[in-house]
Every structure is written in C-alpha cells, then in structure tokens.
Amino acid sequence: MDKNTTIGIIFIVLIFVGWSMFFQPNNNNTSTNSNTEQSLNHNQEKNNLESNTGTRIKHGSLISIENNLLKLDISDVGAKPYSVILKAQKRYDGTTLNLIDSRNSNNNFYFSLDVNGKKVATDTLDFELISKTDSAIVLRHQFNSNQHIDFTYSLSKESYKIDFAVTTYGLNNSSSQLPVKIYWTNNIRAQEENREYERSYTTTYYKPINADTDYLSETSDQVTKKLDKEDVKWVSFKQRFFSASIINENYSFKNIEIKQENIDSSDIIKHMTLSADLPGVNIPQQTYKFWFYFGINNYKILEHFNIGLEDQIPLGWGPLRWINKWAVISFFNLLDSYHLNYGIIIILLTVVVRLVLFPLTYSSYVSQVKMQVLKPEIDAIKAKFGDKDQQKLQQEYMKLYKSAGVNPFGGCIPLILQIPIVFALFRFLPSAIELRQKSFLWVDDLSTYDAVIKLPFNVPFVGEHISLMCLLMTISTLIYTWLNNRTSGVTGQMRILGYIMPLLFLGILNSFPAGLNLYYLFSNIITFAQQAFIRIFISQDDIHKKIQDHKKKPSKKGKSLFQKKLEELAKQRR
C-alpha cells in the first residue's frame, strides 16, 4: 500500500472504530434492586386503587387465541396479555420464544379510569368471558347492572397484528371527566446467545403524529423520556429481531412518559414502561381502538402497515438508509425468493457489491501504481529539499504531479467513496432477521458469532471466544496487506500500521455476526481476484510510458484548485 492509500484505510478504520465504540453496549448495568423497587412502587399503586374499588385480586385462568404465527394468552384478571408465543421462532437454546412472558415477572398492562368518582385500575378487576372463537374473544367486567367495560381481542390469519378495543358502557357520568390513563410494563427477555450485543439493539421507539420516528438511547443504563407537547401514534418495545408494539387507531397518546433500564439478570436484559393519557369517557358507549404488533422485525412486513414501524430496523441514517432500503434489501429479497442458502445469498450480494465498486477499485489501483512509478522522483525531491523548505518541497511535488498527470490522493478518494456502501451493509446484515438461526458450512447461526474456540478467560478487546469466520477474515486482510506491500514498496511505520489494522478488526468484529464477517471475507477474496485481473491489463511499464508521454505535453497555464490549496497549506505550516 502506498502512503495515500494507507491514509484512506486509516480514515475508514477510525470511522469504523468510532462507530463501534459509540454503539458498544455499556456493561455497567443497573442492578435488579432498581427493578424490584419499581415493582414494589407499582404494587403499592395497585393497592391504593384496589382499596378504592374494593375488588379482590385473584389468580385467574388463561384464555387463548392463536393463528399459525403466534399464540396469545390473556388473563381473566385484568383482561391483559399474559403471554405471547411466536410459533415459528425459537430462543437461542431451542426453547419456546415468549415475546411477552408474565410468569415470574412484573409485566403488566392496564387502564386507569374514573368510575363513579373513584379511580379504578383494570388489572385489579375480574373479567368474565362473554364470547370466544379461535381468533377473537370478548371479556367483560360488570361494575353494576348499568355499567360495564369490555376488552375485545381479535387475531387475523397469517398476521402478527392483534386488534384490540376497550369499550365502556355507562361510565360517562363522572363530573371530573378525567383522562383515561394507559400503563404498560414489560421485562424484555433475552432471546439471543450474545446478551450484550442484543441489549445494544434493544430500546423503545415511538412515532409522534407530526414528526419522524424517534427512540431512546440503546446504550444508556437508564433513560426517561417525557413527551407532554407531542401526540404520539405508536410506541414499540423493540429488540434486535422482535417487537412488541401498541398502535393507537382512533385517538393518540398524550402526555407520554417512557422509561427503560438495563437489568442484570440471567434472563432479562431491559425493563421498559409506558404511561400515557387518553381522552376521558364522555359518551354512554365509548370505544378506544388499538392494535398490537407482536412479531418479527422484517422490513417488508413492517412497511406494509404504512405507519413507520419499519423505522425500528436500524438501517443507518441518511444515504446509508437509502442504500439499504432501495438497493440492498431489494436485491436481498430477490435472491431470497429463489430459496437459496443465506450464506450463498451473502456471497452473491458481496459479488454484486464488489462489481458495483469495481470502477473505484480500478481507479484506486491505477493511482497506486502511478505513485509507485513516481516514487524514485518523489524520493529524489525529498532528498534535495528535506525539511529545510517545506513550501518549496510541496511546490516541487505539485510540479511533478502536474507534469505526470497524477492526483496524489487518487488512491485514497475511491476508498472514501466506498464508505456509504460498506457501512450500509454493516448496519443491514446484523439486523436481518432472515439470517437468524440459519446455518452455513460450520456456522450454526449466521446472525451471531461462530465460536469455534471458547476460552476459560476473557481476553481484552477480544472476549471469551474466537470466531473462525472473523479469524479467516483477518487472515485474508493480512494476506491482502502483504501482497500490496510487496508491490508498493512501503516501508517503516506505514508498513507496520498496515498489519496492525487487520488485528484491530479481529478485536472489533470477533463478537459480530458470522454473516457480516462472511461478507468481509468474500469481499477480500473478490478484491484479490479483481486486482489479479487488473494486473493482466495494467503494468508499471505501461503506466511509466503514459506518465513520460504526459510530461512531454505542453503544460497548461495556471494552477489547479487542488494545487493552490496544497500550496496554501504549505505556507500556513511555515
């Protein structure tokens, strides 16, 4: 690698390391004491409400509705979701994937409303089953002969969507007309083997009515967000591959407060809460319509609802998101339609990406060869002027570059132009649920690391395992560096730095998904092939002849903007 190419790679590495550090999960987790305290406070609130209504809490039975994708269990105490099982998915250990699991947990979902001047929490009420089919149920709590409240759940076929309605009858006689409040608390259960990596993708998303989708920080130990000036359409407790979302269909959520905190336990990674206001009951029969999304974070499925739920999938910002949305996902889905192995799909995706980037690779390689040809003359100029006159040194460099028709940063710029595509795939592949628990060769799960060696101790910057796919990627990068150094003649610190950078990638990517490392590995292999192909048609002798021919051409008057800028920088250094 020549100096300018190395500078370009260093620039990419610095961005990559900074990105990784910014999104690195914080290991200083909040202890379970905070969660316990919150649970006690919540129970105290329920007791206060219960004393107003005189309703006794008891352990009730579960009523189920299901389709081929999920099973929803609803408790007749509170008429609330007790369990949501995704039938087509499994946890990393092969056990049932419970997206909502209220066993041994303080999960809760309820409404607080005014009934005859008293504050009532619905999670303390006993509900009676009024009607039930395979896909819908109606539960009712009767306050008296003239007043009751119905909870209706209905589940469509082939869908993760659950329609939910709360209908009040005769509860509009309150003089205060207080807003109805909704509360939802959920302990987020770890579904993946790499808990810390999953935690870094777990957060709360929300969509204001008149603003873009937003979210809480994934890396903070504890976050509270109050939205007292914005009406919100939906709120979602989002994990890496799954989401539990509530969407307000006929009103909007007001005066929202959302909280989340890291939990240090063997099974729970975060605790999330939502509280919000709804309009008060002001007519004899008032219905609040919602729907839940309990399902996978699949871009196509979420986009179908046309309310921005797909924004939860972290595809990157600005141009990165556009590249992923319009190019990467479209081509990925096209290959997926042929029912290929996902490892093969990643390889084919890599081939297409490298072909698209081939003009930049070609330009970078040609520029590198040009700088190699000019190296003896560059060294001669440096030996003549050295550090005595930096301005004169830069002027002589510019004369040489101009006469030879060479851009000294020609090898660096193409590398920088590749950054959006490189980072687009860096965001897409770890978020692609299609890779979850899909095998390829020795890799059991392309969505997580392939730990071929598990260490009995923690190695700083590496972890407690060695990923074979990451190791192969690192070796291929070292080979690529060695081959380039042989032709570029780079020496000294630049040569050493070229070998250090792949080792940094080993530490950074060792805990990243095997699918991502598979992409980088084959990207290196294809680059080898491309450079071998380029060498067939380009030689240093040909480049040298073109440079000499360019020197013989009459020089154009005036200086280029690039040359003027370099000379200005040289003057500033004096």
Predicted regions and their residues:
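A long-range scaffold signal marking pre-active-site subdomains of enzyme folds
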Residues: 25-28, 46, 85
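Helix-loop-helix
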Residues: 1-40, 74, 164-169, 183-198, ...
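Intrinsic low-complexity, intrinsically disordered segments
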Residues: 47-73
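Short extracytoplasmic/periplasmic juxtamembrane "stem" segments immediately C-terminal to an N-terminal membrane anchor
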Residues: 33-54
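Soluble non-transmembrane domains of integral membrane proteins
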Residues: 66-311
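Outer-membrane beta-barrel proteins
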Residues: 3, 53, 62, 152-154
